[in-house]
Amino acid sequence: IVGSYTYVYDYAGVLTDETMEHIDAMNASLFAQTGAQILVSVVNSTGGADIMDYASDLGNSYGVGSAERNNGVVMLLALDNISQSGLMGDYCVVVGTGLESHADDFMSLQSYYLENDFAAGEYDAGVKATFDAFIAWFADFYGVTNREGYIPAVRETYSSGSGYYYTETHGYVAPALGSLVS
C-alpha cells in the first residue's frame, strides 16, 4: 500500500515517499532471505531520553530482526536533539545482540554515509545512502541477493526416495511486503 510503511517511521516529515518505499521493498527482500531487518526512524526529539536507549527501545518494541538470530538494526535520527558535541541534531545506530560483534561496521557506515548529508540538512539523501550501505553489508555477510521486489520462493517437496520433505528456494520477483514481527 503506497503511503503505508512497515520499516520506516518519519515523524519529522523529511523523507520522500520514494525513499520510504525503497526502504520497505529492500527490507522485505532482506527479511525473506535472512530474517534481518533495518528499522529507520526520524523523530524531532527523543524527549530527553538518551538516543541510544531510545533506539534500543524502538527495536525491542517493534521486534526488529529475527528472534532467533537477533539480527535487527535500528537507525535513528533525532533532528532537534543536542548531540554530544553540542550541535543541533543527533543520530545513532543500534544492532541486535546477534550483530554486536559487527556494531562498529554499522557505526562506521553510518558515519561515512550520513554525516555530511545530516550536517547539510539533506536527511533523505543521507538516510537512503546509509540504508543502502547497510543492505550491502547484510548481502555480503549472508551471501544473498538483495534488490527491490526480490523475494525467494520457498517450496517444500516430498522425496519418495528418502521419505522426507525438503525445502527448495528459487528467486522470483514479487510485490514486496514486510513485517517487523518475526
PLM regions and their residue ranges:
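Folded, non-transmembrane soluble domains that reside on the lumenal/extracytoplasmic side of membranes
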Residues: 1-180
